[in-house]
Amino acid sequence: MQFPPSEPSELASLAVEPLVTRDFETRPATVYARLRARYGPVAPVDLHGVPVWLVLGFGEVREVLRDESVWKKDVQHWRWLREGRVPADWPHLPGYQVSHLLLQDDQRHKASRDAVEEALAPFQDADAPQSWELANAVSRHADELIAFFADGGDSGWADLGAQFARALPLMAVNRLFGFPVEQGDDVFMDSWRMVDGGPDAAAAVGRLVAATTELAAYKRQNPGDDLTTRLLAVEPPLTVEQIGLELYAIIVIMSELVSHAITNSVLEVLAGEAGTRDGLMAGPVEELVNRVHIASPPWVNLTFRFPAADTDLGDFRLAAGDAVVPSIAAAHGDPMFATPGSQEASVSSRAHLAWGAGPHQCPGRGLADMIVTTAVGRLFERCDLELGLPVDQLPWRSSTHVRGLKSFPVRYRMRTRQVPVAAPAEAAAPGPAPEPV
């Protein structure tokens, strides 16, 4: 057994390889496996010129996510940033300069999370009218989008990304937030720009926060039965600016996790052999989506954690304030969890980390899963689908954090008689956490 060194390893002195490469875009599992073979459950990597620790092991990722007394999220803990060693134009920096519940610690985080959970509760409660009204609206919007890309024809080509998987969560956001004027696709594209990093990231963050803050101010004068109004009503009260930041965080989750969970679920079916397809579609849609949460989670690498003190993790001793990236995708591929793609790993398993774990587990996971299962269910009930490109030619985003397609071309044929797929749950109750905490 190898023991961590007594002194912390200095990231700057380690020879680290870039994480985001062509291999990572097309075959991320092989990159994680190579890093695991070389370093064990924790590996030093270069993230656009800044060295960070990538956590690969299932047990180690779960430990980091669960223990907020050791692992902090507020960027003020980042030693390299405090010391001025992070370039001002580092592509991911804009996303860390906005304070919301995803990037807060301790009591400040608890206050934000309590407010968001209270406001979200009726939209995730199976007995509340708001939940089934939203679920019915999502189903109706899914049918509208299918009718729109089919345009009255029996068959044709569609981009399921732009014409369905991005559009449906956006329609849900418009309804959930109570936007007086429906937001367009540019809202989700700004989320992409922020998450993927680059020269437009800071401006994208500014536009998103401005839109949600303006909405909060509008709803203060024009309340409705929506999430924004409910956030304005929580006690102790939040400022309009705070509400704008929390709504911004929810938009990011909806655009990144929900839209790509839809396309990844459809791809899981279409890329399989005929027997695999039949097996996947024979069970409830929830089982298919749960399988995809394990085999192809949309949010592959989470936002930074920072050890509050020098800490042993894997085969290294990490220095206080080092940047640490918990990798959901790598954890799900850990041989200690299960063999990637195996039946044991993916069917009927609830022990996944796709929605996180611990104090920062996604508070809207029930709502998100409702949208995904409804979307996938309606697609397969109404259409026969085939891939428009070979699997190895599908265009993946170049992103540290997200595994999703830039576009998803398919050939569809409308069904003359709908073939029922096991229906998703009527409402979006969060239920038990996928990963017990």
Question: Positions of the model-derived regions?
Answer:
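Active-site substrate-recognition loop segments, prototypically the cytochrome P450 B′-helix/B-C loop
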Residues: 1-161, 170-182, 192-194, 356, ...
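Central I-helix of cytochrome P450 enzymes
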Residues: 166, 170, 232-281, 288-289, ...
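Conserved cytochrome P450 K-helix E-x-x-R motif and the immediately C-terminal K′/meander segment
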Residues: 280-315
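Cytochrome P450 heme-binding "Cys pocket" and the immediately downstream C-terminal segment
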Residues: 367-398
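Cytochrome P450
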Residues: 174-182, 232-236, 266-280, 297, ...
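Conserved cytochrome P450 K-helix/beta-meander segment immediately N-terminal to the heme-binding cysteine loop
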Residues: 327-351, 355
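Cytochrome P450 catalytic core segment centered on helix I
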Residues: 138, 177, 186-240
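C-terminal domain-closing interface element
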Residues: 216-224, 303-328, 406-437
